[in-house]
Amino acid sequence: MVLIANNNEKVDYLLQAIYSAKRIKRYLNLPVTLITESYDTLISRYTTKKDVFDKVISVSPNTNNTSKIYRDGQDVSFNLEFKNSTRCLVYDLTPYEETIVLDTDVIVSNDVFLKCFDQMHDFLIYKTSFDVSSYRQIKEFKSIVDQGVDFYWATCIFFRKTDLTRMFFDLIEHIYENYLHYKTHYYITSGIFRNDFVFSIAIHILNGFQSGDFAKSMPGTLYFSSDKDELIYLNDNKLAIL
């Protein structure tokens, strides 16, 4: 498993990663590698807790980050730096031949991800997702823009190191390096750099610029919440969101 955590001035992604790694160990019993720009903070702030990681890889900070609005429930928000480009380089950074990459806020509560290692496809990613609420109608997770290409969640991916996935991640890196061009070509108006968009574009290209079957689905079901929601409690296998 690979977790990527880069702190900004208010959000402690390292602490999220530590919590996530503990759940991964409990439910999946897999080694966990942390990739981070915030290595010094990890060493100074989490001297003992960092031992939950089997390996820590320090990477140089990216100076070309965008910013976004972070919300903490309905009433509190901050405009903060969004350091999320490291995922585009994960093929070269992972120490594993078979890798699951998770966002640090993905809550692992069962062993369904182990099925990734017992199937034949070399690249898996979620396309279909479900809101934990029953009242929201969120269209942005259907396509990257209205009437645009299909949306895929870079939140959670699995890949094996093969010639095909090497080509895919080379394309990911190319799109990242030329993001302004692809953003314009695919009519993306958001000022936020999103890995979801990059992965969705790359999948569209490898499918021959049409819908196709290059990307197979991760096992299980992906549920999501909004940052306007509030997590009331979370224990071993139950959570409550308001």
Would you name each region that the model predicts?
Residues 1-242:
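Glycosyltransferase catalytic domains, chiefly GT-A lineage
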